[in-house]
Each structure stands twice: as structure tokens, then as C-alpha cells.
Amino acid sequence: MHLSAKSFLALLLLGASAANAATIDAATLTAIARLQEEKLHARIGIAVIDTASGKSVSYRGDERFPLNSTHKALLCGALLSKVDRGEFALSDTTQFSKETLVDYSPVTSKFVAPKSMSWQQVCSAAISYSDNTAANLAAQKLGGPQKVTALFAGLGDNVTRLDRKEPELNSAVPGDLQDTTTPLAVSRTLEKLTLGDALKPESRAQLVQWMKDDKVADALLRASLPSGWKIGDKTGAGAHGSRSIISVVWPKKGQPIIVSVYITQTEATLAQSNDAIARIGKSIFEATR
């Protein structure tokens, strides 16, 4: 079959529209990242994965940053992997005393013994509300931080590490390897958990739903999300101005993208860092249309 140049171009454009036409290029990502670094006097790491092509682009993508509460999405992903193996069910319950509660526990504080919580409720609290006690309960169920790190390694992630419980893991001391990841490593692990085959379909859908139900992320990537797009995310915050987010973003057309942004070593306010993440997101989203 002979195709004219015009017809061939039309086919190329059709193919491009079937997937994402493009993701942000390295030069543009570097420019926007450096602009925000200068504004915040911060260190910023970004990773974007185009799941249609498998290609990734990053800025400081292999540098370590504090995990902070972004670990909660991965933590519950690891818990779901145990559910998939039949070790327990999300409907199973746990009880805990008032002494178990730590700072920022808006959900678990309402379920102190003799009340109980299901593991479904625990992970909903940890991801959708960033409840710190819920995260500690999930980590304890998995055998503690080191066992959680081993589960990450089982997913092929030998970079991301959990060393402590909430709230100590948020110390974010510059140069400390404890409780850190890299933008690229965490993005790849998130992709495996939410879009890959690391979890069974039902568990994968549950993790995504918890992230879509995030109640504390409106000022970050969601602030610049185009109309008709969808997002599931998990934010984090810690000492030394640390602010972060990992996300799965579904454009109106095409395949999802993974977007992770980490900010640290700054005296900027939380609102300023939120705005920086929203601006970074806007540039990424505009390039993905």
C-alpha cells in the first residue's frame, strides 16, 4: 500500500494522540527546577515517567531526599502485597492504646481501644489523611522499618529505605541516609505498585483509590491539574523545609504519567514550597497535553 507524505504524517499524528504526545524534556525540566531552587534557596529533585513509552526524565533524579510521609503510599502498597499472599485480610482488625498515638493522628485518635480499626481503615487513614499513627501501625504489621525496606527491595528498589517510625523519620538531616529515596527510585516503585503487576488488580485499584482520596494535597499538583485530568498522590513534609509529593496522573487523553517532586534544605514556608510544586506541575502537565 502506497501512502502519500500527507497520509503518513496523519498516521504519525494519530499514533501520537493515542499515547502522550510528549513529556517534558530534560532542558525544560532543568530550567523550571533551577528557577524554583533559586527562589526557595532549596535543593529540588524531580522525576517524570511517561508510562506510554517507558521513558523518564529527571532533575537530581538519583540524589537522595527525605521520604517523609510519601513513604505511606509505598508502605500500604507493601501491606497489600501481604494481603495478596493471603497472610491477612484488609478486613482484619487491630487495636491500640492511647499511648500508641503520636503527633498528627486525626483518624486513629478516634479509634483507641476498646475500639478497633480494620487494615483497610488504617491505610485509608495513612494515605488519604496522612495519619502518623496509622503509618506506624502498618509498619509494625509488616515487621518494622527494616522489613519494610526489604519488601521494597523485593520490588527491585534497592534505594528507598525506611529506618524509623513516625514522627522521627521526618528529621530530614542533610546527608543522613536514613528514611530516604531518590526521585527516580520512588517513581519506579510507585509505577510498579499502581500500574504494574506488583499487586493483584483488586489491591492495585485499592491503592490507587486511597491516593485519589488524598485530603491534604489540594495546594500542590492538584492546584495546577488541567480540567478533566485525574490524580492520585501522597504528600510529605519534614524538617529543614522538606516538602514532597509522589503521584500518578491520568491526562484527559493518553496513558498515565508518574510525577514525583522533592524539596529540602530550605527556609521557605510550606505555602511557598506548595506553590513551587504547583508551578513545576503546571510545566509538566502543559508539556504532556
Annotate each PLM feature.
Residues T51, L90-V107, L142-G143, L169, ...:
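Acidic helix-start/capping segments at beta-turn-to-alpha-helix junctions
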Residues S81-T100, P145, T149-A150, K200-R204:
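Short, well-structured active-site flanking segments
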Residues G54, P66-T94, V259:
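Active-site SXXK
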Residues M1-F8:
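Bacterial N-terminal signal peptides that target proteins for export
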Residues E37-F65, F88:
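Short, conserved catalytic-motif segment at the N-terminal edge
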Residues A22-K39, A52, Q140-K141, P145, ...:
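Structured C-terminal helix/loop/strand segments within mature extracytoplasmic catalytic/sensor domains
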Residues R43, K115, N136-L190, T194-L195:
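Mid-domain, small-residue-enriched loop/turn segments at the edges of structured enzyme/sensor domains
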Residues L101-N136, P145, D179:
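Conserved catalytic neighborhood of penicillin-recognizing serine enzymes
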